[in-house]
Amino acid sequence: MDRSFCIAPMMARTDKHFRYLVRQLTKKAVLFTEMIHTNSILFGNRNKLDEYFQIENPIVLQLGGNDPESLSKVCQMAENYNYDEINLNLGCPSPKVKSGNFGAALMNHPEIVQRCLVAMQENSSKTISVKIRLGINDNDIDESLDDFIYQLSETGIKVFYVHARKAILDKLSPKDNREIPPLNYARVKKLKKDFPNLEIIINGGINDYFNQKKEFSELDGIMIGREAYSYPRKLQNIDSNFYGIADANRSLSDITKNMFDYFETLENQNDMKKGLIHMHGLYNGLKNAKK
């Protein structure tokens, strides 16, 4: 799978409706589900794994959790679905994640992460990857990050999505954790030099991605989050700029029509409302868009 351009997993953002919209704009960008905790699948709604469309590939299922057995069970279940990759979230900084000891909190427990990753790989034929931060709280982002990457890679993991910031779990909100900890792109680039056999995709604060593409050329890809959600029209030129194939070149009116045709297939009124919310960004920056 070519990870040159990826759209980050975002809670309440990257659901199947937004991903359907994105596929009107780019065929090749790698899409992620929202993070789904293993318990919500095993003890809640098992249909969560079925919330995608065949047109979405390439698509990555992102899981949250810290129990090898639970993760292995969900990986077994995911074998019945057409996901291209399964990603373990080790970067989410929310208080709920911290109290549950998953997400970024697991960066302080590499031995648990190792057991989880071994279990996932033993129970899936799909690529298993991780999404991490540079560290958490007072972690040293030099030696401790290298040690963490090495320990995870020893399990056979080859694909790392790296948010180029620390996560401050005790003092900052998730929103502040996306903005206040300083970006350190140089540290991510050094990871690639130190671990050339690993696939390193950079994430965090990348807004002008067409012009920043050259800045990250030594890495294996870039991952965009809020910018892609807020201004999805910019995604129309991803395929030509990052993959060397023709863009879809759909007009705004065609995209809008396709989305409303899709909405008509939805049986749940709440699903339609969610889908309409995701469309707001299509019109950002256009004259009279707020009308």
Please identify what each model-predicted range represents:
Residues 1, 5-6, 11, 17, ...:
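Alpha/beta catalytic cores of nucleotide-metabolism and tRNA/nucleoside-modifying enzymes
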Residues 48-52, 104-106, 146-147, 178-180, ...:
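Short, hinge-like loop/turn segments at secondary-structure boundaries
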Residues 7, 22, 34, 61, ...:
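Conserved, mostly hydrophobic/aromatic
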Residues 10-81:
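Glycine-rich, positively charged N-terminal anion/phosphate-binding segment
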Residues 1-3, 39-58, 92, 100, ...:
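N-terminal small/glycine-rich loop or linker at the start of catalytic domains
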Residues 10-12, 36-38, 64-66, 91-93, ...:
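Active-site beta-loop-alpha junctions enriched in small/polar residues
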Residues 24, 72-86, 90-100, 111-198:
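Alpha/beta enzyme core
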Residues 29-30, 85, 159, 221:
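Short, Asp-centered acidic motifs that coordinate Mg2+ and/or phosphate
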